[in-house]
């Protein structure tokens, strides 16, 4: 089906926090949960493809992956790339141990592709009819920018992600979108990306050691109100 969603392309490099040695490795299917997904916002509910999450700035990557450590009573689990969700249960709220940092790297890569801007007014208008059944099933009253950002029900945004994945170009054969661009719950200024497996192009991938003096890391810690135990 054709979808006619608003689309965009990466205007610069992508960043993500992932496991050492290569933060750009696709998650291993053996780590998928009972529902067949990795818990990501736009993961495939049918477990036929994986999704890689990134941000336009290092700050966004830090915010998304360290949100689990916030001391808030209702911690936000809307993350890009927590490879081991069990970490959330292992560490004290408000404190990130050094070994968590040591086992991860800041990834940088050049990305190319056509991505659906699902929060755009045109996209929301086009998607309302197509997602009606899922909205009813998951108790979503209205498809708006807020619904896309909600942490739960995650199954709804995963249904939406699969719908975008199945959209076709005007020729009726070629996939229309390589992934999704969306705004983070941590702020309108935090631009995030979800890349579908087998789509788009990632080149010049880098794996960088996380620098304790990184200003983006410091800002993320300040905004999240968490600390790293460097001892």
PLM regions and their residue ranges:
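Active-site and NAD+-binding cores of ADP-ribose-processing enzymes
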Residues: 1-39, 74-231
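Extended catalytic/binding region for NAD+/ADP-ribose chemistry, centered on the ART fold
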Residues: 40-73
